[in-house]
């Protein structure tokens, strides 16, 4: 046990242990060219809330993000494993190696409604740029598209809202399937997360 854990209170240790036990290895979020760092931070906070440990941030058209909006995130970024890529092929090669399928948000005729998708399968969920959505290039790499059912006039949601709706549907399905009652992370990755969290144990 390193010195950071020795300095940790029992209550803090119990909390981190409990949270880590709920982290899901078979669900991730991919953000393609999302411009506003506050949107990214809001997505990170939702990822943390539902037990998604990893998030992939792909920047092919905008500068690499150096930091995320602290106001929205409540420092959620430091509790997640954040992968940043500037090359789409490299990003999705890594994702395909680790996840069974890739689904993108897209308002198209071939898209399936969110509530008809089995989100208990290992899945990477892709959300696109605030203005143009997921690019044709990335949709070509995906295994399918989905949409969030709506009955209003405006047929789009803010990226962080769309992600929250989707992740909480995944949470609902995975909780019913008992996924949060099992240890999901492999031992090496789990240890890496522990090591990172031990440095960040001073605050939420």
Place the predicted regions along the sequence by residue.
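Post-transcriptional modification and biogenesis factors for structured RNAs
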Residues: 1-204
């Amino acid at each position: 046990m390193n010195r950071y854990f020795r300095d940790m209170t029992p209550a803090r240790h119990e909390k981190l242990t409990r949270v880590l036990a709920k982290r899901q290895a078979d669900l991730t979020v991919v953000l393609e060219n999302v411009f506003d760092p506050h949107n990214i931070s809001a997505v990170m906070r939702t990822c943390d809330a539902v037990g998604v440990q990893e998030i992939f941030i792909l920047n092919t058209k905008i500068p690499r993000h150096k930091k995320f909006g602290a106001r929205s995130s409540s420092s959620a970024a430091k509790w997640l494993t954040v992968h940043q890529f500037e090359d789409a092929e490299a990003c999705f090669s890594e994702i395909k190696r680790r996840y069974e399928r890739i689904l993108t948000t897209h308002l198209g005729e071939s898209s399936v409604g969110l509530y008809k998708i089995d989100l208990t399968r290992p899945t990477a969920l892709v959300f696109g740029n605030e203005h143009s959505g997921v690019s044709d290039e990335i949709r070509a790499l995906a295994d399918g598209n989905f949409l969030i059912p709506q009955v209003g006039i405006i047929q789009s949601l803010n990226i962080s809202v769309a992600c929250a709706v989707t992740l909480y549907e995944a949470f609902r399905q995975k909780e019913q399937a008992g996924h949060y009652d099992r240890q999901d992370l492999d031992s090496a990755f789990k240890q890496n997360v522990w090591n990172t969290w031990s440095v960040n144990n001073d605050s939420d």
